[in-house]
Regions:
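Short, well-structured N-terminal submotif of metal-dependent ribonuclease cores
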Residues: 1-34, 38, 44-60, 142-147
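Alpha-helix capping/helix-boundary segments
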Residues: 9-10, 38, 75, 105, ...
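Short active-site oxyanion
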Residues: 1, 29-32, 65-67, 110-115
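Acidic, PIN/NYN-like endoribonuclease modules and their adjacent C-terminal/linker elements
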Residues: 106-148
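A general structural signal for well-ordered alpha-helical segments in protein cores
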Residues: 39, 52-55, 76-83, 102
Length: 148
């Protein structure tokens, strides 16, 4: 099964090492992909050269393995339509400035058939009303791994 961590999971790992115990369980059971939107957000959040090198080190293995998923034109349209439909129902995401980026990550997950693991289940759950994306919280996902 394909797996994507959204930006929030990568940030939590960089700050608190949350993937330290999860990654050994993921290997061999999932095909982990890096979303190029998440990669761009991580790079944009870097304030120092050291941080940029750290993020480059995170991205490089995915590039070498050919496991970076980048939005296509169809993904942009699918993401924009989902946001438009969401707005038409009166719903909004908690961070409207990042709404398109989140919707693009969801569209990427749909295209590659990946489970999207996030700390932002509320917003991705809203997107799932208009995009057939499978979403799990990081906590639920890691508990599932521990029980397997």
């Amino acid at each position: 099964m394909n797996l994507l961590f959204d930006t929030s999971v990568w940030i939590d790992d960089l700050r608190h090492g949350v993937l330290r115990f999860v990654m050994p369980q993921v290997r061999g059971r999932f095909f982990l992909w890096l979303d190029s939107v998440a990669a761009a957000e991580l790079i944009a959040g870097c304030g120092t050269r050291r941080e940029r090198r750290l993020i480059s080190g995170l991205i490089a293995p995915f590039e070498r393995a050919g496991r970076v998923v980048t939005p296509t034109q169809c993904d942009f349209v699918r993401a924009a339509e989902a946001l438009s439909k969401l707005r038409a129902t009166g719903l909004t995401l908690k961070n409207p400035g990042a709404a398109l980026l989140d919707a693009l990550q969801a569209a990427n997950a749909v295209r590659i058939g990946a489970l999207l693991v996030t700390e932002n289940v509320a917003d991705f759950g809203k997107l799932a009303k208009f995009l057939p994306v499978s979403v799990s919280s990081f906590r639920k996902f890691s508990r599932t791994l521990g029980g397997a």
